[in-house]
Amino acid sequence: GPGPGSLTLSLLRSGSDVIGIEIDSEAILHLERIFGNADGKLEIIQGDVLKVKWPNNLSHIVANLPYQISSPVLDLIQQYHYRSPLKAIVILVQDEFAERMSMEYFGSLSPLGLSLWLDFDVKLDKKVPGGAFSPAPRVNSRLVTLIPVDRSIENGAINRKMFRIITHHCFSSRRKKIKTLLSKTPRRISRVTGWHKSRWKSAIEDLISNPPDGFSENWFDNRPDMLEPEEWAIIANRISSYEE
């Protein structure tokens, strides 16, 4: 979303090749009047960022994300990074949303933050007051940097699909105990080949009676946000490896 082009100008001045995705036709005309093609350094793709095909040669993503689509855009960024690794992502989002992304504070784990944790270290940067924008929103924004990491645990690569299913399932009722939450079969478990209600029930019984190494005896009496991301990864891998 290049919009009026302020960020685009700064990126071009850095010597970067810039690709912008802009849905507004008037904004595109404005950008063309101001920049032209910037000596071949600027390409504007017209369309909805949630629907158009992204170029396959991106190295960095720098954007001021609209609040209402921040979550789906982040999901697309993560999908893109999984296919074609990015070097860094710097975005501006709503302050509260940024805290959910980073999980920096005790008890702040969330499905959003845990999903991002699979691929990135999330670093909070400067707050930006609403008055910095026109029209001014009623909330503050926050700069966030996503630094790619190669995430794994002791017993190998993390089962990403199972990890996401389990964390979404448990954090949908985050005030309940983990044992209570895991006793119910996730609605999306059938999306994983070979998984069904009876296999899930047996896997959870095995997990509860034989805790993973390093887990406390009554770990399952905690609420979901009391565990570390690494522990959720261990749980996901332990469940996914269970054979009836």
Residue ranges and their predicted role:
Residues 1-169, 231-244:
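Catalytic cores of RNA-modifying enzymes
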Residues 142, 146-150, 154-211, 219-230:
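An accessory alpha-helical subdomain
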